[in-house]
């Protein structure tokens, strides 16, 4: 279904990203997650799709809020493996989630449809043809469905220097914290 590869599947990059996301005072934890959750409708009994679901953190939050089922897509095999592992730990969720390795540009190939809510957290900046993605999202949503997404402001990553960049052994910038 997919011939693209993800930078997150590189061992060092994935390890650095996991470290970054485990920070309890990160932008994701103190701003983005609470804001995203506040914008969502009541999730009880709803079917949700999370585009660029990463390690499944948002999927777990949706299931904890009584979503009937959640579907996550991501390009990264490593991210999806971690999501599967973490969601399986919560035994009561095991039959209520599905994960697909699929780039957002191929959303039309996702076999599932008729979602009440579609979300995406800090992932749309990877998309070249955003209008085409919005058409595919509209085709996957139920009538009057909801799209909620977050997007990094370019100012957060425009500075080339500074201590906020995670760097690999070659001193290349790989993630911003």
PLM-predicted stretches and their roles:
Residues 1-43, 57-61, 82, 146-177:
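Conserved class I S-adenosyl-L-methionine
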Residues 42-43, 112, 134:
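A short, aliphatic-rich alpha-helical micro-motif
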Residues 45-47:
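Nucleotide donor/acceptor-binding cores
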Residues 49-51, 55-107:
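Class I SAM-dependent methyltransferase SAM/SAH-binding core
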Residues 109-118:
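A short acidic, Gly/Pro-enriched loop at the edge of an enzyme's catalytic core
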Residues 122-125:
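Short catalytic micro-motifs in class I SAM-dependent methyltransferases
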Residues 131-146:
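A short glycine-rich, Lys/Arg-flanked "PGG" loop and its adjoining helix->strand segment in the class I
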């Amino acid at each position: 279904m997919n011939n693209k590869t993800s930078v997150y599947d590189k061992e060092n990059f994935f390890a650095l990203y996991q470290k970054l996301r485990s920070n309890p005072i990160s932008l994701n934890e103190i701003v983005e997650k609470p804001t995203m959750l506040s914008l969502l409708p009541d999730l009880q009994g709803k079917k949700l799709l999370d585009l660029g679901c990463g390690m499944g953190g948002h999927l777990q939050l949706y299931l904890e809020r009584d979503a009937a089922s959640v579907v996550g897509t991501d390009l990264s095999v490593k991210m999806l493996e971690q999501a599967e592992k973490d969601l399986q730990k919560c035994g009561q969720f095991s039959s209520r989630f599905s994960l697909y390795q699929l780039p957002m540009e191929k959303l039309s190939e996702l076999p599932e449809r008729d979602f009440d809510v579609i979300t995406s957290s800090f992932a749309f900046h990877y998309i070249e043809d955003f209008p085409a993605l919005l058409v595919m999202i509209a085709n996957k949503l139920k009538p009057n469905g909801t799209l909620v997404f977050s997007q990094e402001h370019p100012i957060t990553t425009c500075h080339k220097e500074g201590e906020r960049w995670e760097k690999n052994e070659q001193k290349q910038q790989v993630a911003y914290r």
